[in-house]
Amino acid sequence: MSFELPVAVYHRFEAYQGNKQSALLQEVRENLSNTYPQTTMRGDGQVVIVGFNTITVEVVPAFRYDNSGRFYMPDTNDGGRWKMVDPLAEIAYIDAADLNAFGNVRPMAQMLKTWKRHCNVPLKSYQIELLVAEFMPSYVYRHQDYFYYDWFIRDFLIWLCNKAWTNQTIPGTLELVNLGDTWLSRAQTARDRAIRACEHEHEDYTILAGEEWQKIFGDRIPIHVL
């Protein structure tokens, strides 16, 4: 979730010494903590992660750069910088991919964000969205519905395991972001579990399949579906 801050706040933090972006996220976290004192929060590079009971929200403070929809957001990595983003271009890219994949991009992205949270996968939410938007429009089963989501997840994870150290092009700004490989071992583990789950389903071992899916997504996934 992004929210726009007044430009005066930007100038105030520009006068800081040291990591201005880290100071901004710290102030955002403190203000949110005053409103939600019982909620766990932490800064994570470019966002403040707010862990409510039923949902985790990534809060992104931003400053308007121009009237075409581009913004500056904080990036605390490597000493800190202001990173330009174009949310409208990113939304348009996801919309087009979702249309080409028969409405399956957004549900898939939500499922994979659940995996990210449950297994502490070090991929950003926007990276997951862009990866799903890259994968789904050319996926052979993209026209199928949720009855095929087990195959969707399995095949996406197989594909994802070949994406280490590749670059993502961010829509709008055309920035290249390298994916690295810190997430790879968790993706490989999830891939292997998804493969086993699909094999168990094929053999009608639905509870064994459910156990594997719960290892990926947590116990909000039912262990057995009639």
Describe each model-derived feature in a short phrase.
Residues 1-18:
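Long, hydrophobic/aromatic-enriched structural stretches that serve as scaffold segments
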Residues 3-5, 56, 139:
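Acidic, low-complexity intrinsically disordered regions
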Residues 11, 24, 135:
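Metal-dependent nuclease catalytic cores that hydrolyze phosphodiester bonds in DNA/RNA
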Residues 15-70:
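Conserved catalytic core of two-metal-ion nucleotidyltransferases
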Residues 65-98:
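Aromatic/basic-lined ligand-recognition segments
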Residues 98-99, 119:
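Second-shell loop/turn segments in exported
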Residues 104-225:
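Conserved nucleotidyltransferase catalytic core and NTase-mimicking acidic/glycine-rich helix/loop elements
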